[in-house]
Amino acid sequence: MAVKNEAAAKAQPDAQEYTQTLIDKAKKASEAFMGLDQEQIDKIVQAMALAGLDKHMYLAKMAVEETGRGVYEDKIIKNMFATEYIHNSIKYNKTVGIIEDNAYESFQKIAEPVGIIMGITPVTNPTSTTIFKAMIAIKTRNPIIFGFHPSAQRCSAEAAKILLEAAIKHGAPADCIQWIENPSMDRTNALMNHPDVACILATGGSAMVKAAYSCGKPALGVGPGNVPCFIEKTADLDQAVNDLILSKTFDNGMICASEQAVIIEEPIFDQVKKKMIANGCYFVNKEEAAKLTAGAIIADKCAVNPTIVGQPATKIAELCGIEVPAGTKILVAEIEGVGTKFPLSAEKLSPVLACYKVKTAEQGIERALEVVQFGGMGHSSVIHSNNDEIIQKFSDRMPTCRILVNQPSSQGGIGDIYNTNLPSLTLGCGSYGRNSTSSNVTAVNLINVKRVNRRTVNMQWFKIPDKIYFERNSTQYLAKMPDITRVLIVTDPMMVKLGYVERVEHYLRQRQTPVAIEVFADVEPDPSTTTVQRGTELMAKFQPDCIIALGGGSPMDAAKGMWLFYEYPDTDFHNLKQKFMDIRKRIYKYPRLGQKAKFVAIPTTSGTGSEVTSFAVITDKENGNTKYPLADYELTPDVAIIDPEFVYSLPKVAVADTGMDVLTHAIEAYVSVMANDFTDGLAIKAIQLVFQYLEQSALTGDKLAREKMHNASTLAGMAFANAFLGINHSLAHKWGGQYHTAHGRTNAILMPHVIRYNAKKPTKFAAWPKYRSFVADERYAEIARILGLPARTTEEGVKSLIKAIRDLNRKLGIPETFQELGFDPKDFESRVDYLADRAFEDQCTTANPKLPLVTELAEVYRDAFYGRFDE
C-alpha cells in the first residue's frame, strides 16, 4: 500500500503540470477566438466538417481495428452523420456576438463562449463523438481538450488532429483542439477538476459521467440507456421488425439509444417472432438462455460484460457456448421479468435482446416502464403502433426524454434522420437520468447568452364607462336606454326616504315598453360581504338585465359586488381581494362582466367617484372589519349618470366630508407613480373646482357650487381610476374599518400629514418604469402654483398646499386630529402597528410616490391622531 501511495504522489504533480500546459495553450486560443466573427467561425467549422468527411472511411476503419468492436460500414455512417448532419444543423446558428437585436421589445442577446471545454469520449463511438464535440465547440468559439477512452486513443486522436489541421488552416487559433496524449486517470481527473475548465462534455460509462457531474462545474452528460421497444397489435409488423433489427444491429448495438428489450402484445406475438426469425434473429432456449446470461452479464454487478460490447451475435454465441446459424443477427432471450433476478433485462450494448410477451397494451406499457426504471431513466423508449390513444398513454407513462414512435431507436435517438430531433451524439436524459439537460446536446448548449435589456415603460391605459351623462335631469336617459327589461335598483334606506328611488322609477316608467322593477334598499355604510350575498340572492331570483346603483359610495360598491357574484356565483372572494403590482398581470383574473346585466351608476353624493371607477370597497365584518378594495376594470360601470338634482339637498357635513374625499382622490392621482398626461388634466381641474366651490357648496348649498362639486367628483374619479391612489387611502381604509369614521373625513384628517410625509426624500423608492425619479414634492408644489399659492421654492409650495388644506378643513368644520373625535390614545396605541401593517397591505399603497415602511405608516397615523406638525 505504501508503494502505491508513493507512486500516486509522484504521478500527481506530473498530471497537474501536464494539465496546466494544456490549459495555458487553451487560454491563448480562447483569447484569439474573441477576435473572430461569425463568418470566420462558420468557414472554419465547414472546413472541419469537410476534412472529417474526407477521412470518414479511414477513421471508421481505424476505430474498428483499434477497438475491436462495431461494424466498419456502420462506423462510416456514424462519421458521416457526425460531419454532414451535425454541420447542417448548426451552420445557421448564430453563436458569435449579437445574435438577436429586438428594437421593438428593446432587448439584445449577445452570445459568448462558455470557456475551455473538456470532452470525454467513449470506446463505443470514438471518432464520430470526437468529430461532433470538436465541431460544436469551435462553432461556439470554445477551445476543447479531449480525454479519450484509452482503448480508442489512437483513432480518436487522429480524428481530432484532422479537424484541428483543417481549422488552423482556415484561421482558427493554434491549440483550439487538444487532447491528453498519454491518458491516465490522474491526468483525466486533473483536467476535469481544473478550475479553468468551464464545462465538461461527458459521453461514456455511467461512472465517468458521474465523475464529471461531481466536479462542481457545469457538465453535459449522458445517462445509460435501457430502451424498451413495445410492438402493439395495431403496428405495421413488417416495418416494426425491420426497424428493430436495423437499429439493434447498427454498429453491433453500441448506440446507447438501441433497443434492449422487445415487448410484444400476445395477439401478434407469434407473427412477430416468425418475422424476426426469418430475418436472422435467433431465439435461445432455456438452457442457452442460461449460458447467454452467464457470458453476457457480470453477475455480481448485473451489468454487461465488456467483452461482448460491440461484438457480432455469432461471436457472442460462440463465447457463450451456443451454436447458432451463420448470419445470425441478434440473440433473443424470452424472459419473464425485469431486475437483478433477470440479468438480461439490463442494458447490453450488443446484438443481444430481451423479449417479453404481454396480454394487453396496458401490460406492455407497464413492462416498458419497468425496463426503463431498471437502468434507463430519461434516455429513450420506442413504441410501434397505429393506435393514437395507446401511443399517448405510452408517452404519458414513459420517464424518457425521447419517445420514438414507429422508428428505429438507434437512428431515431440521435436525431434528424427519422424525425425532427436535433442531430447529436450526446443525448441528455434530464433529471430522470441525473443529467443537466433533457435535449440532444448541440452548439446552443455551449454558449452563454447575455441579454441586454433597455429600459421600457409599461403600456398604460385610460378606461372609463362607455357612456357618461351629465347636467340636470340627465337621469331621463333611463327612459330611452336600450335593451333592458328587468331592472334592479341597489340603494340604501335614505334614498327611498328622500324620494330618489321614486325619481329613478319615474323615468323607467316612461319607457314605451314597461320594465319590471325590483329594489334592494338594505345597503349599510361600509357594505359587508353579508349584504352583498343577500343582494346577490335577490338578483338570482329576479334575474335583472340592468342593475342601477343609486346612492353614495356604499350602494355603488355593494352593487358592483352583487353584479359580480350574480353573473359568476362561484367566484372566490378571497382571490378577488388579492393585491397586484400591475393590474394587467394579476394572478387572479376577474371574469368578464356584462354577460347577464348592464350596470348603471347614479351617484347621489359628490365624493367617491365610484360611478366611473373600477373599484369597490367591501368590508369583511366576520374577519376583523377589514375593508378590501376590489380593483379590476371589469367593475367599471357601463353607464354613469351625473345628475346634480340628487345632491342639492345633501346636508352640510356630508358635502364637506365627500368633498374632501374628492380632493384626496385628485391629489393622490396627480402624485401617483402612474400619473400621466391623460389623468393630470382631470386631477388638476378637480382640485381647482374643490378649492373654488367646496366651501360654498357645503356652507350655503348653492346649486351651481353643488353641481360643480358633483362634476369634480367624477373628474377625480376618472383620474384615479387610471392613475390609482396612494397611502392616504390605504391608511383611511384600515382606520375606517377599525373606528368607523366617515371615509371622506378620515381622508381629510390624514391628508396634510400624508403630503408632508410623501414630500420628504424616500427611505425606499417606488418601482415603476415610467417614474424616472422621485418628484412627489415637485408635483405638490405644482398644485400649489396652479392654485395661486406661494410656491417660490418646492418646499414653500408643499407647505402652502398643506396650509391650504388645513384651512379648508377648519372652514368645513372638520377636526384637525383623530383624538378630537374622542378616540382613546391607549386604545389607539395598542392598535396602531397592526393598522399600519394592514395599510401597507392595501392595494392603494402600490401606486404611492414612494414605498413606505410599515413603521413610517405608523408614524403618519400618530401624527394624524395627535396633530403633530413640524413647522
Over which residues does each language-model region extend?
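ATP/NTP phosphate-donor binding region
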Residues: Q460-C546, F818
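Conserved C-terminal structural/oligomerization subdomain of aldehyde/semialdehyde dehydrogenase
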Residues: M34, I322-N458
